């Protein structure tokens, strides 16, 4: 759609009035302090409370607007639990509509995963006891309300869930939450002239906004000591995939993916992050000045002016977070460990191969829309399966109750950033996965596998999986 003559004149006037304002969005120089979500740690016998409610939040440090979230703020606190603990979690719904919740990446039985069988009505609670029996990982909790997942997550029903174990606590890597270990929940939104979020789902595909937010802030910065900084990245956007790099070219050292640590750190110049994916990276801030983690290209001046008059899905600014080193370099600095854990060893044979085709203009998986009364896949706990997933329209794909290794992408090698055990992957044409089922589910409480373009999931690109407990 082209600008009318009147709109062009108005836009030109705005540009002239901007004076010394930069014409293109800069990739450095954060403006707002990074909000760090409060940390809730599970203690033996002490429940974790997560109350869903309305709140008020400013996305730009100015006017506050109505949002959703947990415990009185936008988004939710970071929950930290420990392997081998049994965590009592109390979800309280103080909103005016039903919500279901899940913890993506947490390896628990289907009856504890949430979803359609665990709807939380207004002014009601759900109190599962979660047995944490997995290695350290960065997971996330979020709404997965049937047919309402996209607006519920967009409104603010999401937060990070960290699993720690003896290995994660002993590794020589940053682990001081909010000091050298930062959670980054990345979203894109469309804001009105008063800074209030707008949401108009498209008829096909997924929603994309023009404003990049991190922990609910635009263009944030954080001051860090000179040395290694750990960033726990979560893409909580409805549909947008990001390609990340540092503004000054320094490498991102990838140490963990969805389901935990890689065998060894990987130095990458750039990496992608699809909706639902989590990655942990280390950045060396011992040398040089401030540097900004960026996400692709920013809008040009004409694209930004056009956005004044019509909705845009081109990001005004690509800045995720600016790191500002302060102080002197310590006399003794930690070196990056050469190894993080042992190599992955597959202790079983592939039991069968399955193929899945994700819907594009028409939702569904293998041509079938989600039906809560239908089981689409039946398997057994302890099995490995080969899954070939195809998508003509690029989109992320997530599996509950399982973990997988990406074996190939479009018939070629797996991108380095997709190494290690995962539960979410970007599908652009074909990916081959080696899937391991470690938890059991039932027809009453099945696991889901689905498109993580949330609007696609809401339209029916979800299917159900039952993993029967092994007889051994």
From Swiss-Prot:
Pfam families cross-referenced by the UniProt entry: Cu-oxidase_2, Cu-oxidase_3
Species classification: Bacteria, Pseudomonadati, Pseudomonadota, Gammaproteobacteria, Enterobacterales
Listed GO CC annotations: cell division site; outer membrane-bounded periplasmic space
Keyword Cell cycle tagged: yes
Record note on modification: Predicted to be exported by the Tat system. The position of the signal peptide cleavage has not been experimentally proven.
Protein name: Cell division protein FtsP
The protein's role, per its UniProt record: Cell division protein that is required for growth during stress conditions. May be involved in protecting or stabilizing the divisomal assembly under conditions of stress.
Keyword annotations from UniProtKB, A to Z: Cell cycle, Cell division, Periplasm, Signal
């Amino acid at each position: 759609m082209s600008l009318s003559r009147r709109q062009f004149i108005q836009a030109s006037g705005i540009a002239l009035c901007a004076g010394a304002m930069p014409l293109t969005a800069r990739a450095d120089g954060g403006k707002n302090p990074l909000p760090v979500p409060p940390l809730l740690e599970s203690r033996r016998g002490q429940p974790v409370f997560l109350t869903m409610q309305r709140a008020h939040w400013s996305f730009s440090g100015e006017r506050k607007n109505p949002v959703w979230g947990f415990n009185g703020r936008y988004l939710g606190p970071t929950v930290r639990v420990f392997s081998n603990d049994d965590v009592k979690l109390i979800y309280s719904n103080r909103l005016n509509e039903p919500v279901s919740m899940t913890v993506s990446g947490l390896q628990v039985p289907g009856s504890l995963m949430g979803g359609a069988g665990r709807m939380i009505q207004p002014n009601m609670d759900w109190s599962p006891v979660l047995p944490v029996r997995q290695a350290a990982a960065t997971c996330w909790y979020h709404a997965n309300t049937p047919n309402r997942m996209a607006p519920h997550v967009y409104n603010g029903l999401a937060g990070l869930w960290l699993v720690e174990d003896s290995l994660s606590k002993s590794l020589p890597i940053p682990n001081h939450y909010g000091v050298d270990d930062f959670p980054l929940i990345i979203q894109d939104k469309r804001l009105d002239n008063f800074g209030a979020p707008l949401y108009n789902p498209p008829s096909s595909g997924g929603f994309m906004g023009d404003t990049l937010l991190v922990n609910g802030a635009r263009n944030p910065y954080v001051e860090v000591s000179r040395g290694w900084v750990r960033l726990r990245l979560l893409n909580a956007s409805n549909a947008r995939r990001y390609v990340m790099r540092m503004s000054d070219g320094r490498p991102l050292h990838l140490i963990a993916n969805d389901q935990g640590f890689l065998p060894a750190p990987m130095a990458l110049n750039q990496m992608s992050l699809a909706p639902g994916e989590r990655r942990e990276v280390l950045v060396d801030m011992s040398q040089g000045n401030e540097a900004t983690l960026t996400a692709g290209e920013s809008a040009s001046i004409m694209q930004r002016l056009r956005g004044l008059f019509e909705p845009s899905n081109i990001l005004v600014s690509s800045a995720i977070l600016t790191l500002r080193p302060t102080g002197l370099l310590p006399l003794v600095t930690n070196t990056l460990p050469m190894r993080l854990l042992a190599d992955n060893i597959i202790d079983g044979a592939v039991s069968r191969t399955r193929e899945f085709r994700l819907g594009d203009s028409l939702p569904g998986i293998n041509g079938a829309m989600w039906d809560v009364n239908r089981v689409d896949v039946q398997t057994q706990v302890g099995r490995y399966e080969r899954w070939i997933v195809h998508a003509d329209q690029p989109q992320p794909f997530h599996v509950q109750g399982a973990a997988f290794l990406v074996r190939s992408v479009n018939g070629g090698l797996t991108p380095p950033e997709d190494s290690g055990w995962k539960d979410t992957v970007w599908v652009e044409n074909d990916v081959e996965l080696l899937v391991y089922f470690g938890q059991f589910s039932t027809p009453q409480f099945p696991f889901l596998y689905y498109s993580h373009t949330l609007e696609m999931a809401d339209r029916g690109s979800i299917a159900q999986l039952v993993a029967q407990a092994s007889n051994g």
